[in-house]
Amino acid sequence: MDLNTILIIVGIVALVALIVHGLWSNRREKSKYFDKANKFDRTSLTSRSHTQEEMAQPNNISPNTYVENGHTPIPQPTTEKVPSEAELIDYRQSDKSVDDIKISIPNTQPIYDMGNHRSEPIQPTQPQYDMPTANNVASMTLEQLEEQSRNIGFNGINSSSPELRVQLAELSHEEHQVDYNLSFNEPKAETTAQPKQTTGYIQLYLIPKSSEEFNGAKLVQALENLGFILGKDEMYHRHLDLSVASPVLFSVANLEQPGTFNAYNLAEFNTIGIVFFMQLPSPGNNLANLRMMMRAAHTLAEDLQGVILTEEQEIFDANAEQAYLARV
């Protein structure tokens, strides 16, 4: 065989090896996005939806409810809530936990034990200062001077004397200055900043409130209205400049395996949910991109009647949102 034939064969083998390696790497990357998707099933969605409906019910029941189709008002009896035995037990346990609380100041002994002195709270001690001797008239208050004069049995000091009142005013001014200095010298609590996440993925889940599934046509329309484009790996991506040529800020994948959207059957499929994910570091500002992804998730939740969950499959409330923002 001549040299040209050998080179052609070697090139073909190398090309096939590159293609196989690329397909294998692509499948491995996809599996990272959806490891947690297997945890979702129909049963868990149904139970979570019932829990969400119970949480969403108002505490106060209106006096009249309406029949679903007839709009006929039905009077509802007003009942007074009676605490159950479980609530009384919880109250006793919380009361016991309060007894175990001890209030203390740093570098000092506890000044108040709620368990041992519940009915006799100790008043906080005031700082004691060494005042001048009793010979100095200005060191005594007006009431002390009058009491001393009555005890001694002489006419005493004239409390209406202008000189005495000037001295008392100066003493009061000095005491206030001492209090101000003490307040400025109080130790301040040290705050430790949490480390920021610089690599990996940040994810949010969106599932239906009820046991039903998301309609594919409505889901696709809502995603396109928010600027998502179906692109690489058959997923929807939010680009920087709303064009496929610009970098991807974050993406949306199908919660059902293999996590893709069939481009030829988008109007006829249903899904149990979708997942938002953003890879760190992201193009531009991580915090701004994360806020944009959260707004997109909230908008889709309102349009599709869905519920947003965290990576731990908990309700994405205001506290969870602040925790997410603190990560970047």
From Swiss-Prot:
Chain segments annotated as transmembrane: 5-25
GO biological process, one term: FtsZ-dependent cytokinesis
Keywords tagged on the record: Cell cycle, Cell division, Cell inner membrane, Cell membrane, Membrane, Transmembrane, Transmembrane helix
Top-level taxon in the UniProt lineage: Bacteria
Cytoplasmic topological domain: 26-328
All ranges on the Periplasmic side of the membrane: 1-4
Topology relative to the membrane: Single-pass type I membrane protein
Bias type Polar residues, positions: 57-67
Cysteine disulfide links: none
Family matches, as Pfam families: ZipA_C (PF04354)
GO cellular component: cell division site; plasma membrane
Major localization listed first in the record, in broad terms: membrane
Region of interest (Disordered), ranges: 43-82
Compartment annotation: Cell inner membrane
Function: Essential cell division protein that stabilizes the FtsZ protofilaments by cross-linking them and that serves as a cytoplasmic membrane anchor for the Z ring. Also required for the recruitment to the septal ring of downstream cell division proteins.
NCBIfam families (alphabetical): septum_zipA
Subunit note: Interacts with FtsZ via their C-terminal domains.
Family to which the UniProt record says this protein belongs: Belongs to the ZipA family.
Xref: PANTHER family: CELL DIVISION PROTEIN ZIPA
Protein name: Cell division protein ZipA
Organism field: Haemophilus influenzae (strain PittEE)
